[in-house]
Amino acid sequence: MDQNNSLPPYAQGLASPQSAMTPGIPIFSPMMPYGTGLTPQPAQSTNSLSILEEQQRQQQQQQAAAQQSTSQPTQAPSGQTPQLFHSQTLTTAPLPGTTPLYPSPMTPMTPITPATPASESSGIVPQLQNIVSTVNLGCKLDLKTIALRARNAEYNPKRFAAVIMRIREPRTTALIFSSGKMVCTGAKSEEQSRLAARKYARVVQKLGFPAKFLDFKIQNMVGSCDVKFPIRLEGLVLTHQQFSSYEPELFPGLIYRMIKPRIVLLIFVSGKVVLTGAKVRGEIYEAFENIYPILKGFRKTT
């Protein structure tokens, strides 16, 4: 039997390697010198090499630019500090799911009393009830002599170390101290307070003291008004607890301390308002215009 016929069909192709190989491709043999059967093949793709070369070139350019920026400081305009390092603007955006510790931008916590818009004028003018002023008579005084010789004067050193003197026009009261200082209270206007202080100084002069009229100054002004509606003081103190205090068992009025102007207001449930602590008349008017819309918001409906 022939040798080729004894092989199975799938092995017959292996017996003739020349017929099984692809034509044009050389068959390598262990005895063949290295490289004799190889033919140089062209590169399959030149695009990949060009892309790599381009990326390397860009990286080199970026490194060179970074070295130049760090070696040379940025030229700043006159009057400003030059930037020595190349840096990016830092952002303080919070991470997702976290709460920032400080709000941006940070707002001041200074308490401010809400002001009244110009279109919401109350139409109410507070009336001055009392003005306290001080004056220096510029000399030492013998209070016993003043109390004995002056009319409408009383002096009790065990109770109060000053002479209490009163006049009818303007209807005021003066506290005269041995140092020469005098306090005048009870006037309804600035002019009346100055006139009353001059009358007291004239009385002291007539008693033989070299009194002068120095450093007259208004220390406090008190005004009052009525808003004509009842006020819910409990709601007001809860909403404005930073400025107000309300203890009905101790005092029936709500004490409201305004920041600007620095005025203290006594607010009563009936709608009466007392303003004190002003140095000039305009501060009382401004404080009432500021508080009026607040009181209007807490008006009792029943």
From Swiss-Prot:
Subcellular locations according to the entry: Nucleus
Q: Which keywords fit this entry according to its UniProt record?
A: DNA-binding, Nucleus, Repeat, Transcription
Please describe what this protein does: General transcription factor that functions at the core of the DNA-binding multiprotein factor TFIID. Binding of TFIID to the TATA box is the initial transcriptional step of the pre-initiation complex (PIC), playing a role in the activation of eukaryotic genes transcribed by RNA polymerase II.
Mention one GO biological process in which this protein takes part, according to its record.
transcription by RNA polymerase II
Native organism is Craspedocephalus gramineus
What protein name is recorded for this chain?
A: TATA-box-binding protein
Repeat sequence: residue ranges? 128-204, 218-295
- MF term (GO), any: RNA polymerase III general transcription initiation factor activity
